[in-house]
Amino acid sequence: MSLNLRDLEYFYQLSKLRSFTNVAKHFRVSQPTISYAIKRLETYYDCDLFYKDSSHQVVDLTPEGELLAMRTNEILSELNHTKKAIHRSSMKDFKVGFPPIISSYLLSKQDNLNFFNALHMIYGGSNELLSLLLNEEIDSSLLGSLEKIKHPQLEIEELFQKEFFIIMSDSHPLANEKELGFKDLLNEDFILLGEHNIHFNAFNRLNEKYNQSANVVLKLDDAHTIKELVRKNLGISLMADIRLSEDFKNLVKVPFIEEDKQFFHINYAYQKNSILSESEKNFLEILKTLK
């Protein structure tokens, strides 16, 4: 006797809904269809999978049923993942997550943008994109983090790191310092990138060491505007070197002392058991050339 995948689908849904009637409605089949499927599985595994009452309504899973439900969930999830992977491999373009800060840096480093025609670029914060990737709504993603990322579901390659600096006007009293500790900045006014940004997380990590003593006067999502305000000496900021490649006239960047140094990690992530298409492999090779 062979095992029928459809029977497993019926069984798994029954393990969740606990009602033959509701499962039949879910699949738009007759109730006897579900009943016969369960009987076939019980014959195949030579055990009862459910405790049933006299009206043939499911009361609960037997221990064997609990075990099969857990394994069936894994099997169906893997089959669904495989189906998506095969579908993705046949697509000419692929969905890649791009945090705006990383995409700006990446695009500024390219001499030819023709390759990007093969990309379906999905913009969002790193946390949002990570969620999309884990739910298989995108194929891969660039991700920013304050440390190396590890996840059992993902293959993650760290591409490079960029140091965080204190950014200030070249006329600021501290502009000529070779390095500064965060405690030296507690009386300064900070103008920062918003709370959903890795930069704000880096600032918070330092600020927590000093009981949130630093003064934040403004949070914006536009790095260019922040630089303009800092240039006018209306405050200072904290930015990773990835943000400092241009528009730096009349600004200085001062490194943190060793114990306060923070780093922006730029990563590329995709499903661990996925097979990369030629386009994806080429894209990864381009990413590996960046620093």
UniProtKB/Swiss-Prot annotation:
PROSITE patterns, per database record: HTH_LYSR (PS50931)
UniProt-listed SUPFAM superfamilies: Periplasmic binding protein-like II, Winged helix' DNA-binding domain
Entry keyword set: Activator, Cytoplasm, DNA-binding, Transcription, Transcription regulation
Keyword Transcription regulation: yes
Gene Ontology molecular function: DNA binding; DNA-binding transcription factor activity
Recorded GO CC terms: cytosol
Positions of the DNA-binding region: 20-39
Job of this protein: Required for malolactic fermentation. It is most probably a transcriptional activator.
Sequence similarity: Belongs to the LysR transcriptional regulatory family.
Annotated protein name in UniProt: Malolactic fermentation system transcriptional activator
Higher taxonomy: Bacteria, Bacillati, Bacillota, Bacilli, Lactobacillales
